[in-house]
A protein has these predicted regions:
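Flexible loop/turn connectors
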Residues: 151-237
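Short, polar loop motifs at secondary-structure junctions
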Residues: 69-74, 142-146, 161-162, 186-192
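Hydrophobic alpha-helical segments within soluble ligand-binding/sensing domains
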Residues: 50-56, 70-109, 203-222
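An alpha-beta-alpha
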Residues: 87-131, 225-237
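Hydrophobic/aromatic residues located in beta-strands of well-ordered beta-sheets
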Residues: 66-67, 108, 185
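Short, conserved loop/helix-junction motifs that constitute active-site signature segments
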Residues: 57-63, 102-103, 175-180
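Short beta-strand elements in bilobed, periplasmic/extracellular small-molecule ligand-binding domains
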Residues: 2-14, 108-111, 128-146, 155-156
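Alpha-helical recognition/docking segments in bacterial nutrient-uptake
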Residues: 1-89, 93, 156-159, 163
Length: 237
């Protein structure tokens, strides 16, 4: 951590470009460091890494005060602190780690919400397709877990949103399939509750991301650091 003498404020902009710009302008000279996780959405609720206005606003921040976390698809040339996820290759690599268990299933489904309040990078989708194609696995893309979804023995689902995970596990139990036997489930991004419930996850290490940012701030160092992304094997696969 940065230490007990530091003070941190959290401002949430809900992937909204206008709100982000207003927050940044309002707090232009308020802080020693600006830690930004750049994820934006279009009017059609699609994910974009940045907007031209956001890049211009971020570029006004002195680079020795700038920390970009999570998403590094932003056009800033001068060196600064950058801890990022490689969304496409992260999911590809994590699924490859679990390949021996994944191959026992007949078909893979990625539940990727096309229109979400907090949209997800499409690079997740690209990495999943790349994995399935390379290892000749049958797959499909779903927008959500519907209440009347048809489940078959041998299906493996990868969910991103919590609501889809809850709906899926509920239906697996109601239809008397065995979780991790008849039907597999992998969830994107780990939480303590998923650990408690034995849900297999593929996840970046958010704690490590924060620790790396704190260390680089204290060391006054700059540079790009890829954050670890892990396959966490539990009972649902």
């Amino acid at each position: 951590s940065i230490g007990g003498n530091s003070h941190t404020d959290l401002h949430i902009y809900h992937c909204d470009n206008s709100l982000f710009l207003n927050l940044l302008e309002k707090n232009r000279s308020a802080y020693d460091y600006y830690i930004i996780m750049p994820h934006f959405k279009t009017e059609q609720m699609k994910h974009v890494s940045y907007t031209e206005e956001a890049v211009r606003a971020i570029n006004k921040i002195p680079k020795d005060k700038l920390v970009i976390m999570d998403n590094n698809r932003i056009a800033i040339e001068d060196p600064f602190i950058e801890i990022f996820q490689d969304f496409e290759n992260d999911i590809y690599g994590a699924l490859q780690e679990g390949l021996s268990k994944i191959k026992k299933y007949s078909k893979l489904f990625l539940v990727y919400p096309e229109n979400s309040v907090y949209p997800y990078p499409r690079r997740i989708l690209y990495g999943f397709r790349k994995f399935c194609t390379e290892f000749a696995l049958d797959y499909d893309i779903l927008e959500e877990i519907y209440d009347d979804i048809i489940l078959k023995k041998g299906d493996l689902f990868i969910t991103i949103e919590e609501s889809d995970l809850v709906n899926l596990v509920t239906q697996i139990r109601e239809k008397e399939f065995s979780l991790g036997g008849d039907i597999g489930v992998i969830s994107y991004n780990d939480t303590p509750l998923k650990e408690l419930l034995g849900i297999t996850c593929i996840s970046t290490d958010f704690k490590k991301m924060g620790e790396t940012a704190a260390r680089m701030i204290l060391d006054k160092s700059k540079g790009k650091v890829k954050n670890p992304f892990n396959f966490i094997d539990r009972d649902s696969l």
